[in-house]
C-alpha cells in the first residue's frame, strides 16, 4: 500500500480511482474504480509531474468501506500506529459523511480501533473478541514490580480476573525463542501476584 499501512491480505492488484465518465484502458494488475473524489480526499505526490493520490484519511475510509470488518480495523489501527492519521481525523471524516450509505459501518469500525494496538494480529483478535461479545481487555497492559521494573507487557489483560492474553504469529517470531521468553515472563508475572497468572496464547 502507498502509505505503508499493514495489511491482513496483500492486494492482488493496484487499485486506482478514475473520474466518473472518464475513458480508460484496461491494464493487467490494475483494478479501476469509477469515483469522483473531492479535493480534501486527494493530494499531489511526486516531483515536477506529480500524481494525485488519496490522502491517508481517505485511504483508511476507502478500505473501511470495501474490506471485511477485521481487515478494515487492522488498516485503521496501522494508520494510527504509524502516525499517518489520528482518531480525531477519522472521526471528523466519518461525521462529515452523516446520512450517506455505509456510515454506520464506518462508525462500527471506529468503535473497534485501538490507539495502543501493536500489531495486525492484535487487531484481528480484538475484532474476534468483539464479535463473540467478550469484554474488551486492556491493551498493552504492563506488569511491574514493587520497584517499578517492567516484568511483562501483555497484548490484552483483564486484571480483575488475573488473565493475560497473547497473540503471536509464527511468521513473526522464532517459536523456540518465543516459548522460552513467554515462560519466563509468565513465571515472573505469577510470582508478583503470589499465585498463578493465566496467559493463554492465540495464533493464526
Protein language model annotation of sequence segments:
Residues 1-104, 138:
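Short gly/ser-rich loop at a beta-strand->alpha-helix junction or flexible surface loop bordering the NTP-binding
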Residues 80-204:
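Surface segments flanking catalytic/ligand-binding clefts of nucleic-acid enzymes
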Amino acid at each position: 500500500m502507498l502509505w505503508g499501512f499493514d495489511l491482513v491480505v496483500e492486494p492482488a492488484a493496484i487499485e486506482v480511482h478514475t473520474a466518473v465518465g472518464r475513458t480508460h484502458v484496461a491494464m493487467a494488475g490494475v483494478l479501476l474504480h469509477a469515483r469522483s473524489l473531492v479535493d480534501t480526499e486527494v493530494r499531489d505526490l511526486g516531483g515536477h509531474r506529480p500524481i494525485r493520490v488519496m490522502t491517508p484519511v481517505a485511504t483508511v475510509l476507502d478500505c473501511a468501506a470495501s474490506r471485511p470488518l477485521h481487515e478494515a480495523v487492522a488498516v485503521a489501527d496501522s494508520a494510527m500506529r504509524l502516525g499517518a492519521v489520528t482518531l480525531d481525523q477519522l472521526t471528523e471524516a466519518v461525521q462529515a459523511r452523516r446520512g450517506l450509505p455505509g456510515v454506520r459501518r464506518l462508525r462500527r469500525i471506529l468503535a473497534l480501533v485501538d490507539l495502543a494496538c501493536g500489531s495486525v494480529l492484535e487487531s484481528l483478535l480484538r475484532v474476534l473478541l468483539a464479535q463473540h461479545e467478550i469484554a474488551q481487555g486492556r491493551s498493552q497492559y504492563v506488569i511491574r514490580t514493587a520497584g517499578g521494573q517492567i516484568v511483562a507487557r501483555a497484548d490484552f489483560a483483564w486484571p480483575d480476573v488475573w488473565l493475560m492474553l497473547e497473540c503471536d504469529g509464527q511468521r513473526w517470531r522464532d517459536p523456540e525463542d518465543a516459548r522460552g521468553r513467554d515462560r519466563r515472563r509468565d513465571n515472573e508475572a505469577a510470582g508478583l501476584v503470589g499465585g498463578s497468572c493465566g496467559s493463554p496464547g492465540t495464533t493464526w
